Every structure is written in C-alpha cells, then in structure tokens.
Amino acid sequence: RAADDAVLSLHLADAESVRALAGACLGHNDCVLYVIAAGYMGVSRMTPGVREYTDSIRCRPAVYASAEELPLAGVQVMMASGNVSRAVAAIRGGGLALDYVSSDPGVIDITPRGVGKWSALLELCRMEGIPPENVAAAGNYLNDRDMIEHAGIGIAVGNALTEIKALADIVLQHDCEHDAIAELVDKLLAM
C-alpha cells in the first residue's frame, strides 16, 4: 500500500489452494491458520496465544469452522502457527499454488506462489524506475532473506538470526524497537 492507503499491487491466493490448506489445518488443535483478505481476518481456532497476538495488532478475527466460511476468492496472505508442519505438508504434498517461509519460531507466512517481500520490492522498483541495486532492505528473519541477499544494501537489525547477519552488507547493533533507524542513518552518513 502507498502512503495514501492506495493498493499498488495485489496478488491473490488461488481459491482451491486456500480451501485445501484450510481443510488440512481445521480440526487439529495443534495448528492455527490465519487467513487475511480485504476487510477480513479469520483464524481456524482461538487460543490464548492467538488472542494475545490479535490484541497486539488491534484486530478481532472471525473464527471459521469450515473453508466455505472464508472469502476464498480474495485471500491475500495466510499465516500458520503452532504445528506448522501440518500446513507445510499440505502445501508440499498437495501441490498447492502457495509459497511459505518461516517468519518467527513456530510461525510461517503463506503467500500466493512467487509472492514475497523481495518480489514486492522488485515490483515497486519497476513501478518507480529504481534499479534494485539502488535499494536498501532491512530485516531479521528468514522471510527477509531474499531482500537482504539481493538488495543493493542488505541490512540486518540487531536481533536478526545469525544466518541473516551473515548475508547482510550492514549489521546493526540495535533492533527495530530500539533505535535501529537512527543507527542506520549514522552508518549510511559515515559511508
């Protein structure tokens, strides 16, 4: 989204892939599937951890009991937490048109095939006529890997995984909650 909240680009998940993934996760108490579409956030079950997370982002998700309750034709992104191996097995074994990447311990982001942070950054670069080598990208986890690896300047914040820090051109001491931007500006001005 742009600063004015306009949607710059939208890639929706394949409805049958969403249906299959939701079906694989529903009815199992060890995996929660979050489904996000325009104006909609749903979860396969409510747990104290889900409540804590959704409270932190000021959201009250719907709790869906079947895939038919989902806006199947408009799903933008999904996330699984808990026993994510159930979701991974469904994606891999079912030939679903979805990609996944770990975004936190015990959490995976699930996107339409070919869609991720780096592909989104490349699309924005094309829209604005900016060569990707003139872009900086920062992150801390596996879902940031492609961006950090391929951007002109890859930046790992202080709480980044060791393997993410190893890929970065710049490694910050601070994380995003504690002055990473100020530290980055100082480092860039010193270059």
PLM regions: where:
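Short, flexible loop segments at the rims of nucleotide/cofactor-binding pockets, characterized by
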Residues: 10-11, 54, 149
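Conserved acidic, metal-coordinating active-site core of Asp-based
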Residues: 18-20, 24, 28-138, 142-145
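Mg2+-dependent phosphoryl-transfer enzymes with acidic/Ser/Thr/Gly-rich catalytic loops
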Residues: 109-191
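Short glycine-enriched loop/turn motifs at secondary-structure junctions
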Residues: 3-5, 69-71, 103-104, 149, ...
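Short, glycine/charged-enriched secondary-structure capping and boundary segments
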Residues: 6, 47-51, 90-93, 151-153, ...
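Short glycine-/acidic-enriched loop or helix-start segments at secondary-structure transitions
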Residues: 3, 44-46, 87, 147, ...
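Glycine/small-residue-rich loop that forms an oxyanion/phosphate-binding "nest" at active or ligand-binding sites
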Residues: 3-19
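Catalytic cores of large soluble enzymes that bind and process phosphate-bearing ligands
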Residues: 9, 13, 79, 173
